[in-house]
Amino acid sequence: MSKFFRRRKFCKFTAEGVKEIDYKDLNTLRQYLTENGKIVPSRVTGTKSKYQRQLATAVKRARFLALIPYTDNHDV
């Protein structure tokens, strides 16, 4: 038997009953971005594939409208 118990991942959007992810909800979108601005994969976050696709679309829309940056590291 293993010593450590890995906590089961669950989809926060399913638990909260979200129907569609809004691109204007920046606090939610930032939870699913890395510090470099990349979208975190669903195998890490535990989101269902339906919501992961909506999340990716919402992040891309927010980036296009300059609500969130494409990258956070700008070393000049």
Curated annotation (Swiss-Prot):
What are the transmembrane regions?
none
What are its GO biological-process terms? translation
Q: Where is the signal peptide?
A: none
What the entry lists under PROSITE patterns is as follows: RIBOSOMAL_S18
Q: Cite a single GO MF annotation.
A: small ribosomal subunit rRNA binding
List the keywords (alphabetical).
Answer: Ribonucleoprotein, Ribosomal protein, RNA-binding, rRNA-binding
GO terms under cellular component:
cytosolic small ribosomal subunit
An example Pfam family from this entry, by short name, is Ribosomal_S18
UniProt record similarity statement: Belongs to the bacterial ribosomal protein bS18 family.
HAMAP family registered for this protein in UniProt: Ribosomal_bS18
Question: Tell me, how does this one assemble?
Answer: Part of the 30S ribosomal subunit. Forms a tight heterodimer with protein bS6.
Describe the task this protein carries out.
Binds as a heterodimer with protein bS6 to the central domain of the 16S rRNA, where it helps stabilize the platform of the 30S subunit.
The protein, known as: Small ribosomal subunit protein bS18
Its lineage reads:
Bacteria, Pseudomonadati, Pseudomonadota, Gammaproteobacteria, Lysobacterales
Q: Source gene?
A: rpsR
